[in-house]
Amino acid sequence: MPVDKKSGNGRPSLDSVSSISTTSIVFDHLNDLEIHKKHRPHLMTESIRRDDHLSDFDDDDPLKQEMDGEGDLETGPFLAGRDAYTFGGGKYMDRKFRRIMIVVAGLLVAAWVGGLFVYIASKSYKHATTVEHDPEKTKAAALTSGKKITMDQVRSGTWYAASHDITWIAGPKGEDGLMIEVGADGKDYIVIEDGRAENPDSSAEAEVDVTASRRTLMKNGSFRYQGRMHIPSGAEPSRDQQKVLLRTEQKSNWRHSHTACYWIWDVATETAEPLIPASPDARVQNAQWSPTSDAIVFTRENNLYLRTIGSKKVTQITKDGGADLFYGVPDWVYEEEVIAGASTTWWSEDGKYVAFLRTNETGVPAFPVQYFMSRPSGASPKAGEETYPEVRDIKYPRSGSHNPVVDVQFYDIARGDVFTVDINGGFADEDRLITTVLWAGSQVIVKETNRVSDIMRVVLIDVKKRTGKTTRTVDVGKIDGGWFEISQNTKYIPADPKKGRDQDGYIDTVIHNDGDHLAYFSPPDNPDPIMLTSGPGWEVVDAPSAVDLENNLVYFIATKEGSTQRHVYSVQLDGKNMKSFTDTEAKGYYDVSFSSGAGYALLSYKGPKIPWQKVVSTPANNQRYEVLIEENKELAESARKYDLPLLNYGTLNVEGVELNYLERRPPQFSEKKKYPVLFHQYSGPGSQSVSQKFSVDFQSYVAASLGYIVVTFDGRGTGFIGRKNRVLVRSRLGEIEAQDQIAAAKHWASLGYVDPSRIAIWGWSYGGFQTLKTLEADAGRTFSYGMAVAPVTDWRFYDSIYTERYMLTPQQNEDGYTKSAVHNVSALASNKRFLLMHGASDDNVHFQNSLTLLDKLDMGAVENYDVHVFPDSDHSIFFHNANKIIYDKLENWLVNAFNGEWLKVNNAKPVELVHPTQLVREREKAKLRKRWQEIQNK
């Protein structure tokens, strides 16, 4: 379930600002009383609205136009309590009281002047920070007097860390360290760069042909064909770099897939020809070069074709593709939940065979997605039907319904025939998921599971002999009662006796020591691997990252230094001599991409400090290379001049399990105050929200600029806390996760700096589901408010592959599905209020989820909620300014909640009409009551 500066303002120190504001407010309101004393209106006992706050201070706040009354810098906006303030039970405010106020004000002024003198003399005041944002340092000392971050900055990407992607390619002769650049500033449009020739070490440069360091494949970012101009949106060079496959007129389909017009660019002649000569404007779903650069396989209208280079011949490989049959491309559910990509086509390394998936959706029910404001198909409606919504029917298998039937097929280029290989003992068609297809020389490794993903088998197919066998079967349910994790990272290791590899093999992720670890299977049919990593207490992540075949080294990312960190390591193929590639002495969260031969790497440091990127040589490379390509200077400057939240990392023990949390505190946090708390979580199985990555997002904004505490807490069921704690949620999604969020909220409610009456929770997608389940389980005892965006409310409505992995089928687990649905509306009614938002054209979590919940709320006469629907928005909620609106709604709704506005929604009664001057007097008195209460509290 799944979504890219200025100098300090020189304000006085925090202490000075707060003192000035306190005394000034007293005198201002004494003057107000003098002006209005002749009217002497009664003071009514009432809850004080936060929009009545004075906002004379902090006038430069960019959010002030959107929200009345920010409050002063010390308090932060909207932190005052909600209790009613009264003076003498409604008696007149007489002269005696005024004299008391004057005396109090005088004492406060004297105390402030004396304190200011001592404060300045001791030189203990702080200016805006001048150091790089460091979460570890902010634990000890708050950043002071900086600018406030704004939601517009968060939305516009001001706080995004700049980053670069490198597309590594192998040279025509297998050369390592080559990169392709497309559309780079100051360079030709498509350029092959050889990093070896730009080595800072001059001695290494001498070994490389510098003239070959940069090769242009396409000079201009456009081309003409038959008088028409075309602008590429993507490019893929052939292995021999003589031609380039170009995409134009690209149109998005689902999350990963698209259609486009494809062209073959000839580097030597600088001309283009259509991939399909007879149909230049034909829309193609997927196209791939053969490793031998002499052919392209592609899918059009769900059929597979072969284009031979050197001729205009196009061979149709399959002929029955259509609405229900897919060849070489995934259907919706495989694209979303299995492949995480747009292609199910795989060339053999010698270019003699093509493996592909055949997906049959004949039995899969369709779900209609309606578009009321737009027509994504681009088709014009029929005359007289212009006012009807466009409907797109998606074959969407829900839990317990018919799944697509998927099998692996092969095309023999020389013989021109399609064939399959039957394996005894396999899963039945309706009970089979194919998760991995990997060429291993002339053999193919296929990993498949049953539909509930708890039995996995590995099949080895010999395409030349057209035979196959099952090499190993793993019953994950018997290991820990959990499920098999889908991965696309299995790596083939070819035999090389000179390097000590007598036989072919492959590296895969297996369950070992309560976690995911790397295993080396050689030969491929050997069921007993060499364990490359073993733990316990840590796991590998999306591993392996790369294999250096020259040096028998395997690179991978792991949580060895801590579950919220990511470091890069290497290990030998015999499982010995594991070394860190990154600096493990400091906390860090790294990502990495390796060159084709693993001699070079793009190393990306993502936090906790300001992110940076370097291109470096790997330890086994004798040519030392290190170039900083991104240091995010502008981001670092912003972090120095803006007040960012204080980050407090830790663990909370729940049921004997140490669970990670991240507490974001306001920049001027004080344990003497009472703060509202917003919990933000995703909570999906195997997910992780608490990490050491640098991030300034909506949660950061709420903490830093609204002045609330924001807690992210990863409960049981989430990732990297050991499989036994991850798989506890199987068959009962939402139950344990809710218990853990409630336990965390109770912990924060017990803290002296938290207002236990103002605790809220929010989330999107699975996080929206978990928000509702937590409110349901808590029934208002701990959480007062919640905000759920695009939530699942009944797992019977979600797709089969994702849902059944964790819940089994509804037929197997009827009681579990019933309990996991959001169903106890009386418990939801016990909360003060909650917000529900959804995109009406969500193809992932269907709008039916929210409509079903609304119907249950109606049937239960529950009214303590608000709803916002976004027309034509999908799961990301972006259509027609929707993404801005949804975050504005989240912010304003939360502020109103913590201000107590939602306490007035039941048994609404009209307000007695009064003269406008009376309203002014009442408002001024309300301001005074509030400020007097603040003085007493201090």
From Swiss-Prot:
Residues 121-938 are vacuolar. Its main location: membrane. It is found in: Vacuole membrane. InterPro entries: AB_hydrolase_fold (IPR029058), Peptidase_S9_cat (IPR001375), Peptidase_S9B_N (IPR002469), Serine_Prot_S9B/DPPIV (IPR050278). It catalyses: Release of an N-terminal dipeptide, Xaa-Yaa-|-Zaa-, from a polypeptide, preferentially when Yaa is Pro, provided Zaa is neither Pro nor hydroxyproline. The keyword Repeat does not apply. Residues 1-99 are cytoplasmic. Its EC number is 3.4.14.5. The chain crosses the membrane at residues 100-120. It holds the Pfam family DPPIV_N. Glycans are attached at residues 220, 360, 824. It is a single-pass type II membrane protein. Type IV dipeptidyl-peptidase which removes N-terminal dipeptides sequentially from polypeptides having unsubstituted N-termini provided that the penultimate residue is proline. Belongs to the peptidase S9B family. PANTHER family: DIPEPTIDYL PEPTIDASE 10, ISOFORM B, PROTEASE FAMILY S9B,C DIPEPTIDYL-PEPTIDASE IV-RELATED. This is Probable dipeptidyl-aminopeptidase B.
